[in-house]
Amino acid sequence: QPNEISDALDVRSRDTVEMLAKVLPSLTFAYDGKIAYLTITNDLYDKDVQTDSFVSYPRYIEGVDVAIMFKAVEPAVTRVSMRSKSVDVSAVAVAFGGGGHLRAAGCTIYAPVEEARTQLLEALGKLV
């Protein structure tokens, strides 16, 4: 049925949308707006809420080349998802022990989210 396909692609749970509303205020820009990122802090993190699509939201912003989502899954463990229009984010992910594709990659950084963010942005800053 067409509506089932549409629902599978477009419909989000209420929990996911409520989480997005909490995370969007964290939107931050770096490197003259070429990088935009969202952060899910430890107090917001809920393993039962689907947040994988959140990394796409910063990509919709004019001038943004690299979109990142930092997810603090434990006090000293940060999961990172990256999407890019032209930067090889897989090279950055591999440098942090992760992997992926040229334009979509991720890694886990064993550091608090603030420290992980600083490390990753420094590495990406050399590429944008």
What are these regions (language model features)?
Residues 1-96, 100-128:
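Hydrophobic helix-and-loop "lid/oligomerization" segment in the mid-to-C-terminal part
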